[in-house]
Design a protein with these regions (language model features):
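Catalytic machinery of carbohydrate-active enzymes
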Residues: 1-299
Length: 299
């Protein structure tokens, strides 16, 4: 009854009380369920020579956690354990893993890129192995995730990394070189942006999902499609690209790791991707998109 009275006659107090209840609830959840797990990470880093990381995806999130893995590998042997078939609450039809963060098919495509990294000792599917750092906690903790998603993993491991440095290692692609490449998911598209100006450029390749390509080809009529056999090949193509363009999706996450020329279309509704280091730009608006593209394309 008191809450109803305040809601009607004292809305400021009602909102303050509501906010306080949320805070107290979050504190209780953290204390009872997560504080020990966060503290135990530091004990493992201090006392162990070998560290096993658990990650269930999405694919880009696994790539974005690699700077932390690479940093820890300077003093520890590092194993990356991938959990497949963890149900995702955000199911959408175009996602290649369907109702999961990551399925076995996607794992098989990701494995060659992960095992290529010299700082990772081994990559395995999760089968109840002992885990020291559980990156999956980031989706459970009572915190707001609307910040740079490459920094999520800092808050699980307690490790701060210079994100301007490369953290992916691949060779150049043998055939597809010096092209404009695009990978633009149907999620997180910016409604202020139009890609049609790219139609005047030759040799533009889409290297993502076929459904996404078919939609973008209606806008860029001369857009070509290249089907990557796995994400290692995708990374090799991105490394060899003149410019890679994308929104908040795997292509940009890979380009960030390589520090190759890249431009990211940022979602105005969930801006969790930021550029770090050389050869990269991010944009919200069309005029900046075209400006940054010209800067990189004319280098």
């Amino acid at each position: 009854m008191k809450n109803l009275f305040n809601k009607i006659f004292n809305p400021e107090k009602y909102l303050a009380d509501k906010r306080l209840k949320i805070i107290e609830k979050d504190k209780k959840i953290f204390k009872e369920k997560y504080e020990k797990q966060i503290n135990d990470v530091q004990k493992s880093l201090k006392n162990k020579d070998e560290i096993s990381f658990l990650h269930a995806g999405h694919i880009g999130d696994i790539i974005n956690a690699l700077p932390v893995v690479k940093e820890i590998s300077k003093s520890h042997k590092c194993n990356l354990i991938i959990q497949t078939n963890l149900p995702s609450p955000d199911v959408y039809s175009s996602h290649p893993a369907g109702k999961f963060y990551l399925n076995k098919k996607i794992y098989d495509m990701l494995y060659p890129l992960l095992i290529k990294q010299s700082y990772i000792e081994k990559v395995e599917i999760y089968n109840s192995q002992p885990i020291d750092i559980n990156f999956n906690l980031i989706r459970e903790l009572p915190i707001n995730l609307c910040f740079d998603n490459k920094r999520y993993w800092f808050h699980i491991a307690g490790i701060q990394v210079d994100l301007s440095k490369k953290y992916l290692e691949v060779e150049d692609h043998a055939n597809l070189k010096n092209r404009i490449t695009i990978c633009r998911s149907l999620r997180y598209q910016n409604p202020f942006i139009d890609y049609s100006f790219l139609e005047k450029y030759d040799d533009i390749y889409y290297i993502g999902v076929l459904e996404e390509y078919e939609i973008l080809k209606k806008i860029i009529k001369n857009l070509k499609f290249y089907e990557c056999k796995d994400f290692l090949e995708m990374a090799m193509i991105i490394k060899s690209s003149k410019v890679h363009i994308g929104n908040q999706t795997l292509g940009i996450d890979i380009a960030e790791g390589l520090k190759s020329p890249r431009i990211v279309e940022v979602s105005p509704y969930f801006p969790t991707v930021q550029i770090h280091g050389e050869n990269g730009y991010e944009f919200y608006f069309q005029t900046h998109f075209e400006k940054y593209f010209n800067v990189l394309n004319n280098k």
